[in-house]
C-alpha cells in the first residue's frame, strides 16, 4: 500500500498546491494565450506524472517515437487496461496530448480543471448529441495543432485482449483530416489492477507507437473497419511486448 499511497498523496499535493495556476491560466486564455497555457500546463503534468510513475515503480520502454510527426497534430488511438495508461502515455508523448475521457472524471473539481488545461474533453457515451459535440471539439483541437488521445474500447479492460473498438470514435481524425498513430500499451495493469488489495508494485511498461495512418487516403471499405484493423495491430504488438 505504500507505493499507491505515495502516488495518491503526491497527486493530491499537486492538485491543491497548484491552485494559483488556475487564475494564471484563466487570465492567459482571456488574453489569447491558450497555446502558452497549454505548453506550461503540459510540462507541469508531464513532470508530475513522471514522479508518480517513479513512485509506483514503473520502468517504461518506448518504441516508435520516430513515427510521430514533428510538425502535425495527431490522434493517438490505444488500448486501455489501467489508470496508469494515462500517466505512462502522456509522459511518453512528445509535448503531451489531450485525452477524450469518460464524463465521470469531470465530477472531480480540481482534476477537471487540470484536465481542461491540457485540452482533455469529457464524453457521455449514453448521450449521442453530447458525444458528437465532443468528437467535433476534439477534431477542432487537432485542427488547431493540439494532439489528442482516445481509447476506443470506451472503458478499462483487464481481459487478455482489448475489447472491440468503437469505430465512431475515429471520426475525430476524419473530421480533422489528421493522421492516426496507433499505440500499443502493455504492463500498466501489472502496476496496480493485477495486484491484490489495490497495491502498486514495480512493473515494466511497454509503449509502442505505430506508423501514421492517413485517413484521407484510405478506401471507404478500409476506413469503415479501421478500428478493428488498429485493434488487431495492438494485439499483435502486445504479443511482441510479452515475448
Please name every model-derived segment:
Residues 1-59:
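N-terminal membrane-anchoring alpha-helices
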Residues 4, 132-243:
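Non-catalytic C-terminal accessory region of glycerolipid acyltransferases
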Residues 55-63, 131-132, 189-192:
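Short gly/ser/thr-rich secondary-structure transition/capping motifs
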Residues 61, 82, 107, 134-135, ...:
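Amphipathic coiled-coil/heptad-repeat helices and related helical stalk/stem segments
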